[in-house]
Amino acid sequence: MPELAELRLTADYINECSQGKGPMIHYIKIEKNPAHKGTHCITPESPKDYFSLSAESRGKELILYIKEGDKTTPLRMSMGMSGHFKLTNTGQESKHAHLKFYRKDGTTLSFVDVRRFGKWKAGETWSTNRGPDPTTEADEFKYNVLKNLDKRVFDQPIHLVLMNQKYFNGIGNYLRAEILYRLPEVNPFMEAREVIDNCPMLLELCTTIPRKAYSLGGGQLKDWENPWQSDKEKFERFIKCYNNKNMGHIMDKNGRRFWFDPKWNIKMLEHISKQK
């Protein structure tokens, strides 16, 4: 699943395709795959004239701005497990293209989503149930966590709370593993409140680790195609813990595999016994 770094790279890709270094690209039509009929995929009406497209990310969300003349319509998107954008010649779009933006120059920018967990909604801005972006709103992010430490959600182990998008918007499976691995003194099965109270570096890493992932070009994650030709080897060297056969791992209560330093195996067993 694409995480904070991959969402920002997706926004960069859309902006590069739509603006680049030359004249503004003109779009002429928006088309939704008729397979999407639910309320989770509300598509704007196709503008009657040429329109431009730009994008911005915040945590795990993306907003496309569809601008026709003086009118701008936001289109909020989540990528799901496999969603990404791809520019092709018109008529050569993937069979898994579920939202298409046709361009005057004979090309199409498509939202491709093999597993179809992605969703979008026209006219919507950022979700109110997601917290600030840890990288672009670092101060707001820290404040949001610290002011809510008395909430019951922080009774849970830190490895679970890091996946809570209300407080850690953009942190996903590989980022939580890398953040916690870089805190060797932190038991990942300890109560989140205690960890945050005693280890302020945790919140710092929630900012610096995603920034580093972004600067390295993001990952080529399972079921997700990176729109950029990033240096795969550099990113793989950056990933120390996630999906590493030498690390410990456990399925968390949300069904996601959590990777951790194996020195915490005993604490992991204690955690499992408490759940029974």
Role assignments for model-derived ranges:
Residues E16-S46, E56, I63, E68-T72, ...:
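Basic, nucleic-acid-binding surfaces and adjacent catalytic neighborhoods in DNA/RNA-processing proteins
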Residues L99-R103, R130-A138, P157-N164:
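Short, mixed-charge, low-aromatic patches
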Residues R115-D155:
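A short, charged helix-loop
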Residues M1-R130, I196-D197, F258, K267-L269, ...:
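Acidic, proline/glycine-enriched N-terminal capping motif
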